[in-house]
Amino acid sequence: MTTIAVVPVQRLSTAKSRLAARLAPDERRTLVLSLLDHVLTALNAARQVDAVILVSPDPEVLEHAARRGAIALLQPGVGLNEGLRLGRDEALRRGADTLLIVLADLPWITADEIDALVAALPERGIALAPDRHDHGTNAAALRPPDAIEPAFGAGSFARHQAQARSRGLPLRELRVQGLAFDIDTPADLEELAGHAPVGASSDESGT
């Protein structure tokens, strides 16, 4: 099995705009790159991941990721799901039979949690890691890589579940702290500042 991870990152000039009331543009840029570094470090340490593709329309992000061992893929347009489809196609071209999608704003993600998500995959199907509110999807493992279409954004967890059901695909759901906690709002920043990173939980459920 060949598992390739795809990490999408938008332009630094527009990233984390919901934090604009709390952070200046330079501070948001620093935060985005710091979170990305942590995610790439975890992916590089994961035993189940063979390669990492970083998709972005921002040349600075691509250069930053390439220095950390990622395959840098320029996204001609904009849009999270457009970038993920581009990354998926590149992963297929490189021989992937399993696609791992991981968002770039997970400050507590660990290599063990990444491995657990891939290990949760059935022979053919999907494994989802929702955010802590069960609204969004922070990571997804797909076998084959085009098992479902990426539908990330607000409410994506329900959309991905619905796709799996409509296609008759087995679905597993993994809820662990490092995959569930993302940085979107000032409240998230406050929680991050008030808590030290913790190790992976073993909680797992499947449907």
Curated annotation (Swiss-Prot):
Coiled-coil boundaries: none
EC identifiers of the protein: 2.7.7.105
Keyword Transferase: yes
InterPro entries xref list: CofC, Nucleotide-diphossugar_trans
Gene3D superfamilies, alphabetized: Spore Coat Polysaccharide Biosynthesis Protein SpsA, Chain A (3.90.550.10)
The reaction(s) this protein catalyses: phosphoenolpyruvate + GTP + H(+) = enolpyruvoyl-2-diphospho-5'-guanosine + diphosphate
Pathway(s) served: Cofactor biosynthesis; coenzyme F420 biosynthesis
UniProt: phosphoenolpyruvate binding residues: 137, 153, 156
Keyword entries, A-Z: GTP-binding, Nucleotide-binding, Nucleotidyltransferase, Transferase
One Gene Ontology MF term: phospholactate guanylyltransferase activity
UniProt keyword Electron transport, yes or no: no
Function: Guanylyltransferase that catalyzes the activation of phosphoenolpyruvate (PEP) as enolpyruvoyl-2-diphospho-5'-guanosine, via the condensation of PEP with GTP. It is involved in the biosynthesis of coenzyme F420, a hydride carrier cofactor.
Family listed: Belongs to the CofC family.
Miscellaneous: The exact nature of the substrate is currently not known. This entry has been annotated based on its similarity to Actinobacteria.
Name this protein carries in UniProt: Phosphoenolpyruvate guanylyltransferase
Recorded name of the encoding gene: fbiD
